From Swiss-Prot:
It is an enzyme of class 2 (transferase). GO terms for biological process: dTDP biosynthetic process; dTTP biosynthetic process; dUDP biosynthetic process. The gene is tmk. ATP binds at G10, P11, E12, G13, A14, G15, K16, S17. This is Thymidylate kinase. It catalyses: dTMP + ATP = dTDP + ADP. The lineage of its organism: Bacteria, Pseudomonadati, Pseudomonadota, Gammaproteobacteria, Pseudomonadales. PANTHER family: THYMIDYLATE KINASE, UMP-CMP KINASE 2, MITOCHONDRIAL. Belongs to the thymidylate kinase family. NCBIfam families: DTMP_kinase. GO terms for cellular component: cytosol. The keyword Membrane does not apply. InterPro entries: P-loop_NTPase (IPR027417), Thymidylate_kin-like_dom (IPR039430), Thymidylate_kinase (IPR018094). Pfam families: Thymidylate_kin. Phosphorylation of dTMP to form dTDP in both de novo and salvage pathways of dTTP synthesis.
């Protein structure tokens, strides 16, 4: 049986991690091998790169440096976690992947989408997620949720304009490829969001069997 690669995307405070855990629980109840992972990160080396990316520092990080670090972490993550899990037939649930790069570095930072696409092909080859869930909510709601968690990381310290661009980039990608994306209203109560997530499980099982 081939594996299934599902990514969960969205801006700050959208509840990706909570819903990833919920989806994993529901899939494991059906006897499936589920791997939970995240980006940036997912391996010891990639997690160290994550710290560089998220920790505020005195030295400003050049946008090209940020982009290359993201893909360096991704290359390690793919080699050590994602590809092996898919090869054994697991369902991989990943909190962020390359759509986040298009949204944050492309939309938020304004980097060339062509440059991102070149790195995507170099690092990933033809590997793309089978299904991407975008947890969408108003920027001010997401930032308020992020602030309530405590100290903000380097990205969470960006302003409204940055995150409006991130949100717009996500929705544009979903509109451009509706067969791969499902947009979930993350501004609802958690139980309503989880009902929407659970409603997608039959589709996931069909994709897994294809």
């Amino acid at each position: 049986m081939k594996g299934l690669f599902v990514t969960l995307e969205g801006p700050e405070g959208a509840g990706k991690s909570t819903n990833r855990e919920y989806l994993a629980e529901r899939l494991r109840a059906r006897g499936l091998d589920v791997v939970l992972t995240r980006e940036p990160g997912g391996t010891p080396l990639a997690e160290r790169i994550r710290e560089l990316l998220l920790t505020p520092a005195d030295e400003p990080m050049a946008v090209d440096t940020e982009l290359l670090l993201v893909f360096a972490a991704r290359a390690q993550h793919l080699a050590q976690v994602i590809r092996p899990a898919l090869a054994r037939g697991a369902v991989v649930l990943c909190d962020r992947f390359t759509d986040a790069t298009y949204a944050y570095q492309g939309g938020g930072r304004g980097l060339s989408l062509e440059r991102i696409a070149q790195l995507e092909t170099f690092v990933q080859g033809d590997l793309r997620p089978d299904l991407t869930l975008i947890f969408d909510l108003p920027v001010d709601v997401g930032l308020a949720r992020a602030a309530a968690r405590g100290r903000l990381d380097r990205f969470e310290q960006e302003g409204m304009r940055f995150f409006e661009a991130v949100r717009s980039a996500y929705l544009q990608r979903a509109e451009a490829a509706p067969s791969r994306y499902r947009v979930i209203d993350a501004g609802q109560a958690l139980n309503a969001v989880q009902c929407d997530v659970e409603a997608l499980i039959p589709e996931l099982l069909v994709r897994l069997d294809d």
